[in-house]
Every structure is written in C-alpha cells, then in structure tokens.
Amino acid sequence: ALLSCKCEANSGYGDKWLFHGGCPNGYGYNERCFIKPGAVCCYPPSGR
C-alpha cells in the first residue's frame, strides 16, 4: 500500500511517492505538493 501524506492546502490525505519528478501518470492525480526530503504528495488518493 502507498504511504499516506497530507498537504496543508488539502483536506484529507494523499498518496506519498518518493521521487522528485512529481506524481506518476495513470493514477488520476490532479493536485500535488512536495514534501522534503525527496517526496511528493499526490491527490486525490488512488485505490481507496
């Protein structure tokens, strides 16, 4: 399962990905924020 993360500007939790390039395609993400170090939080969470 993907780790959860939270962005101050979003309600609820997103999916945490451990890379710099942004959110991966194919998961329906439409918002993101970056979390240090080297992670990105993607909304809306997939598979929940």
UniProtKB/Swiss-Prot annotation:
Pfam annotation, one family: Defensin_4
Positions of the pro-segment in this chain: 47-48
Keywords: Amidation, Disulfide bond, Neurotoxin, Protease inhibitor, Secreted, Toxin
Bridged cysteine pairs (disulfide): C5-C41, C7-C33, C23-C42
Signal peptide: none
Modified residues (Serine amide): S46
Location in the cell: Secreted
A GO term from the CC aspect: extracellular region
GO molecular function per UniProt: ion channel inhibitor activity; peptidase inhibitor activity; toxin activity
InterPro entries in alphabetical order: BDS_K_chnl_tox, Myo_ane_neurotoxin_sf
Record function comment: Neurotoxin that induces paralysis when injected into crabs. May function in antimicrobial activity as it displays inhibitory activity towards the B.licheniformis enzyme subtilisin A (SUBTA) and the recombinant S.maltophilia protease 1 (rStmPr1) enzyme. Also displays inhibitory activity against various proteases including the porcine pancreatic elastase (PPE) and proteinase K (PK).
Further facts: Negative results: does not show any inhibitory activity against chymotrypsin, trypsin or papain.
Similarity field: Belongs to the sea anemone type 3 (BDS) potassium channel toxin family.
Protein name: U-actitoxin-Cgg3
Organism: Condylactis gigantea
